[in-house]
């Protein structure tokens, strides 16, 4: 971090950190625009009535008294906390606070993590390989062929900085030994664009294709599949049925199976698109099983390592919630079971309209938001107690996925708080002191710094980088290094099972919407710049072009040229994208890199609040989504059908790409002869 005269100027990764090695993604680089954003709240505010956007400045003492009174007056179990993926350090305070009140655990649901399939993937690893659920890190650098089923790891999946480095190592070999990448997904992402083969698979068919590949390997005795103890896992697979369901011919499936088995260190990765369907649990397991069939699990050449257990319970964070947990909270709120709701996130924007969070929020008597800007959910709050930005805050986070070793990342202020904001950790510690009793006993620290010192003291006696018995030296070392991690690689490997379950099957996926009325499958995807929409208030991210379309500052819908011609659509036409639950307007982008039966829309735009750079730009594709769930209760975000309605008007999409020559080439393609 470059700081001059008390002002932050430039952010970079920590060169000592085992995951990023000094590199940073676009969203990390743009963090300065969170700190210096002109639309940040300067102090605590009260809104009366909710939804009017008439905010009255409030002294922090008055605000904390109001909240403490509300907590004390709440019915038993009627205090609730909703958040996205909050820092582990905040979870370590919120968890004991709620427990002291005999309130249910926090509901922590992150839409980007859901689109990445984190929980489904972790649960599948635990289910197949005989351990606890643990998020894997796939060793691309040591692989010689990678079959990626919808894992867009060069853009947004899990840790694109770490995976980008690993992919560079995969491609860094001598000519002919540069690794081989096959990308299975219905839309060509940046990862598919750099792959050796892109397989435009039908949405929801990833699991049956993985099963078919395994079946071919077993039947032909390819590679380590010959006499494998895991062969029975694939016994029920139907190669012809998989070809029909996926749109990938049986001949190509055979070619792919032989290619996968023909390498020494093959790796199969189940990415977000596999986990976005009602068959998520079955399909993710099917892809993972290819690694076991290839003999690439559990030894020094394992295709993946696992997130290790935390060094101490203090660093474990809170359990991540499923979409089913969110639905249960919504029902509690709607039924009057929540007197006070704390919100650390933006569920009114992040959740599908069909989830009906707006109506449930209106039923909550008192709502407290911790947003540093007025977002859609904060507009419906009684109090906004703005948190510091991360550049003004203390905290810690266990890296997940961890790479080749456990890493406890540190967070410390690089500048003094610019405004009269307050760390959310300090707010809960203050409330605990005011409430006395069990809350004070559970959270005895007067402020966040003392809490952090106590947490870091648990590292005393651990191995390098600062092996010492002195807590003060550990605290100093943690701040100097920027966290804690071993100096040498120590991956946690999965256990190789004796045999995977026999006769595994992947059922037919369900889709929301009747095919005749809604003929296209919707493929929402995470924006490389805006993420799930949290980056929309940062103009550097707004103007960052999408790597495949070069679009920015608006919302577009990607449509195959054949589909566009059939609908009479041209580039920059405005259409209505309609699902059974809602509708949005979007600009047409004619894109050959997508299946004709699929339309794709990026996440991130469509805010009605969140400041001048985010509000009233584009549309929010999350509004269209179904509330169907897959295994483990996760949202089946890729299971929505839509229709396209031309609106008879045009709006030019801001983009770097020019159509000069492109449209001419398309016309040439159509010409006879």
Language-model segments: residues:
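N-terminal leader/propeptide and maturation segments of large enzyme subunits in energy/redox metabolism
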Residues: 50, 56, 215, 222-246, ...
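A glycine-rich, hydrophobic/aromatic-adjacent loop/helix-cap motif
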Residues: 260-335, 483, 495-499
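Phosphate/diphosphate-binding loops
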Residues: 356-358, 362-375, 413-425, 429, ...
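Flexible glycine/proline-rich, aromatic-decorated loop/lid segments
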Residues: 375-410
